[in-house]
C-alpha cells in the first residue's frame, strides 16, 4: 500500500519527525533516534515505504462503481438511461490504456499467488475485445434510435445488432470459465455475465417498440431467467472454491484469505445480488435495493518494514493462528447495526524516554440496530492505567480511516501496535463532514500509513470523498498476541440506509436482517452468497422479528408485500403492522431437507391483498406458521410494492393460463413442447403459486395439476 504523500508522512526514518501532521497535538514532537540498529539496518528499513496487500484501488473502484451505478438504475429505466448505463460500463471496462480485464486478472493472480495459463489469458482477452467492440457498435446504434424512435431503419439496425450481440455473449461466456482457471477468471466472468443479463433485459424493456416479436421477447426473457440462475450458481461456487483453497493455519494465509473474500465480494458477489432485479416482470418500476453484507479491510500492522528482521511484520511476530484471527475479528451472523460509540483503551510499550509507543490495546463498542436496543461488546485489554479515549459515532457515517501501523523494538524483539487512527465522518443527510482522531504519543521505530480508501475507494472520482464514499465503518475487531495488537475494520455498503424508508412510487426491498429484534426461535444465519448479506431462519412456527419502517407520504398509498424465501416445508406466512394483522397465505416448499441453499431454492412471492400505513413510523412483522418443527424456513428480504404497479389478480390469472398453455404444443394440448426445460416448468409453477387463493382457489388447483402433469412428462422424457 503506497504512502499517499511520502513528503508529508516520513516513514521509518531516522532523526526525523514522526508523522508530522497539521494538528496542534503533534506540533512539538521530539526527534527519534533508532536504538540498537546500525546505519545499514536503517537503510534497509527506509527502502520499504509501502505495504503490499495486493490491492489496486483503481481495480476495486471499477467493481464498486459499476455495482453502485446499477443499484441506482434498478427497475425499468428509460431508453436514454439504458444508453447512458452502457456508456458508463464501456468506459469502465474498456478504457483507453491498459486493459481493465488484464488488471482484473493480475489482481486475483496476486492474491492467490497463481498465474492464469497463457492460452486461457489470451483467449479471454481476445473474446473480451470482440465483445467490447460489438457492444460499442450496439450502443452507438441504440443512441441513434433513442434520439428518433420513429425511424424504422434505425429500429431495424438496433434489432439486428441486438440479436447478434446477444448470441455473441452466449458463445463467448465459456471463455471466462475455462476448466482449472475458474477462480482467477471469476471477476471477468461476473462482469461479462452482468452485461449479458443487462442486454437480455433490453428485450423486455423495448418490447415491440424495438422491433422484436412477442415470441422473440418471450425467448429472451426465458433465457434471462435461466442465465440468472446459472451465472449466480457459478459465481457463488467458485468464490467458495477460491476461499477453501486459501484456508490454512497461520496469520499470513489469513491475510490472503481475507483479501480474496473482500475483493470478490466487491467485484463479483455485489453484482450477483442485483441479477434478479433485472427481471422487468417482477420489477417493472424503479426499485430500491440494499447490500447489507460486511467486508473486512486489511489488518493494521507493519508489513516488511525491515528485511533484516522478518518478525517486524505483524503476522510473523508470534501472531495468533488463522482460526484464532478469524474468530476474533469476523463477526458471527447478526442483525444489521450501526456504531454509536467507541471507547479506546491504550497500552504503553516503552524502551526508553525517546523510544516508546502508546498503542490501541482494547476497546468497547456500542452499537444499535435500526430502532433497537443498544448492544455493547469489548475486545482486548480494557483495564489499563491510561485514560480511555471516547469517540461518538451516533448518526454519523465514518467513511474513511487513516491508521498508522507502528513498530517498537526491545533489542531485537518487535512490538506491533496502532499508535494513531484518524476517523473521517459525515452526517448522511447534511453537508457536514469532519474527523476525529486517536493519538496519545509515539516515538517508536517508525510507522506505515494504511488508508482504508486504498481498499474501499469512493464510487466516483468526480466528487469529494465525503460525498461519493462507498462504505461506512460498522465494527472494529482486534488481533491480539503477546507482541501484536492489530486492528481489523468491518464495513457495510452505504446503500444499507439507517431509516428503512418506503417510497410511494418505487419498489422498496428491505433485507430482513435490518429488523430491530429477533423473536424467540429465530436466528440470523450466514447468507448463501447471492443475497447481499445475512438471512433469517426459523425451525418452528413463530415470528421472525420486527422491522421499524418509515413511510413517505401520501399515506393513502396502498402496497402489497412480497418476500424472498426458501423452505423445506409447506407453510403459512402472516404479516402485521403495529400488531394488526394484514396478510395471511399458504406457500409451498422450495427445497428438500438437507439440501444446500442456492439460487434455485429461493422464490419471490407475495400477497394479493393491499394495505396502507397510517403512521409515519410503523413496525412491520412477519412470521412463518403451520409447519412441523425441525423444518427450515428462510427469509432474505421483504418487498413493498405500490399497488398501482402490481399485477392485478385478474391479469395474473390470465398470464398464468397463457404460460401453462404455452408449455404444450398447439396440435396436441397434452403434448409437451420439445424445447421446454425444467426451469421453464418451475417458472410457470412459481407464477401459479403466486395467484390469489381468495379469488382463484379452484382455478389455481387445476393449473397446478396441469403443471404437475408437464413435470411428469418431462421426467419421463429425460429417463
From Swiss-Prot:
Q: Which UniProt keywords apply?
A: Sporulation, Toxin, Virulence
* Pfam families for this protein: Endotoxin_C, Endotoxin_M, Endotoxin_N
CDD domains, alphabetized: delta_endotoxin_C
Which InterPro entries does the UniProt entry name for this protein? Galactose-bd-like_sf (IPR008979), Pest_crys (IPR038979), Pest_crys_dom-III (IPR005638), Pest_crys_dom_I (IPR005639), Pest_crys_N_sf (IPR036716), Pest_cryst_cen_dom_sf (IPR036399), Pest_cryst_dom_II (IPR001178)
Q: Which GO terms describe its biological process?
A: sporulation resulting in formation of a cellular spore; symbiont-mediated killing of host cell
Q: Which GO terms describe its molecular function?
A: signaling receptor binding; toxin activity
Keyword Membrane part of the UniProt annotation: no
> What does the similarity note say?
Belongs to the delta endotoxin family.
The remark listed among the other comments is: Toxic segment of the protein is located in the N-terminus.
Functional note = Promotes colloidosmotic lysis by binding to the midgut epithelial cells of insects.
Known PANTHER family for this protein?
Answer: ENDOTOXIN_N DOMAIN-CONTAINING PROTEIN-RELATED, PESTICIDAL CRYSTAL PROTEIN N-TERMINAL DOMAIN-CONTAINING PROTEIN
Protein name per its UniProtKB record: Pesticidal crystal protein Cry1Ic
Q: Species name for this entry? A: Bacillus thuringiensis
Q: What is the lineage of its organism?
A: Bacteria, Bacillati, Bacillota, Bacilli, Bacillales
